């Protein structure tokens, strides 16, 4: 049985330099949810994050860099005594093209350093997530520039559609659980 979502974590890098970069797809989805609910992020320096309150759920943005996201999420989970399965994580995914989102109940990091940090600090791989496709770099050896780069102007329309789809998937997951949401949103073509 799916655990109810109590905390939604968007992964990204803090600061203006990284706003609207591919690696910050998780932050972008969280910003949309916060706007929908009129929620305002406030700094929680002790737990290294920004937190906003949604309807029965916490929205959390780590204020650490991506590779250290667990330094925020692990302490938040323990402070609020949350089951890891109730911590829903949104992150970028280079293995999917822009336009594709996939929900996953649990699993390995798959090479994503932010997820590796979460697994290390949460002590488990068993937390649901939404993987937000950002596509592969155009050339070999350009991964860092790709994930830290901004979306191109010609990608903006598809980005907006995909952010809306991700927002819908989160809301559906909150109401119906990750299993049912995955059956619907994972079947939708990009």
UniProtKB/Swiss-Prot annotation:
Know the name of this protein? Peptidyl-tRNA hydrolase
Organism annotation: Akkermansia muciniphila (strain ATCC BAA-835 / DSM 22959 / JCM 33894 / BCRC 81048 / CCUG 64013 / CIP 107961 / Muc)
Q: Name one Pfam family in it.
A: Pept_tRNA_hydro
Q: Which reaction does it catalyse?
A: an N-acyl-L-alpha-aminoacyl-tRNA + H2O = an N-acyl-L-amino acid + a tRNA + H(+)
The active site is formed by 23
The record's similarity note reads: Belongs to the PTH family.
Taxonomy of the source species: Bacteria, Pseudomonadati, Verrucomicrobiota, Verrucomicrobiia, Verrucomicrobiales
Query: Mind telling me which residues the site (Discriminates between blocked and unblocked aminoacyl-tRNA) is annotated on?
Result: 13
Gene Ontology cellular-component terms for this entry are: cytoplasm
Instruction: Please give the subunit comment from the record.
Output: Monomer.
Q: Which GO terms describe its biological process?
A: protein quality control for misfolded or incompletely synthesized proteins; rescue of stalled ribosome
Give the matching PROSITE patterns: PEPT_TRNA_HYDROL_1, PEPT_TRNA_HYDROL_2
Q: What is its EC number?
A: 3.1.1.29
Alphabetically sorted, this entry's keywords are: Cytoplasm, Hydrolase, RNA-binding, tRNA-binding
An annotated Gene Ontology molecular function:
tRNA binding
What does this protein do, in the record's words? Answer: Hydrolyzes ribosome-free peptidyl-tRNAs (with 1 or more amino acids incorporated), which drop off the ribosome during protein synthesis, or as a result of ribosome stalling.
**InterPro entries in the cross-refs:** Pept_tRNA_hydro, Pept_tRNA_hydro_CS, Pept_tRNA_hydro_sf
Q: Which residues does the UniProt site feature Stabilizes the basic form of H active site to accept a proton point to?
A: 92
* Top-level taxon of the source organism: Bacteria
Compartment annotation: Cytoplasm
Q: Which residues are recorded as binding tRNA?
A: 18, 65, 67, 113
* Keyword set includes tRNA-binding: yes
Q: HAMAP family, alphabetically?
A: Pept_tRNA_hydro_bact
Top EC class, one word: hydrolase
């Amino acid at each position: 049985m799916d655990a109810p979502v109590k905390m939604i974590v968007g992964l990204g890098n803090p600061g203006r330099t990284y706003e609207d970069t591919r690696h910050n797809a998780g932050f972008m989805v969280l910003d949309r949810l916060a706007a929908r609910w009129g929620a305002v992020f406030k700094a929680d320096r002790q737990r290294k994050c920004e937190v906003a309150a949604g309807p029965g759920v916490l929205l959390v943005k780590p204020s650490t860099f991506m590779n250290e996201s667990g330094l925020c999420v692990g302490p938040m989970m323990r402070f609020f005594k949350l089951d890891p399965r109730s911590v829903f994580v949104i992150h970028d995914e280079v293995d999917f093209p822009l336009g594709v989102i996939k929900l996953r109940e649990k699993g390995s990091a798959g090479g994503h350093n932010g997820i590796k940090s979460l697994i290390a600090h949460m002590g488990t791989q068993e937390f649901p997530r939404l993987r937000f496709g950002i596509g592969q770099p155009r050339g070999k050896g350009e991964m860092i520039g790709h994930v830290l780069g901004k979306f191109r102007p010609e990608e903006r329309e598809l980005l907006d559609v995909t952010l809306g789809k991700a927002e819908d998937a989160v809301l559906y997951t909150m109401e119906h659980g990750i299993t049912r949401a995955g059956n619907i949103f994972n079947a939708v073509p990009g």
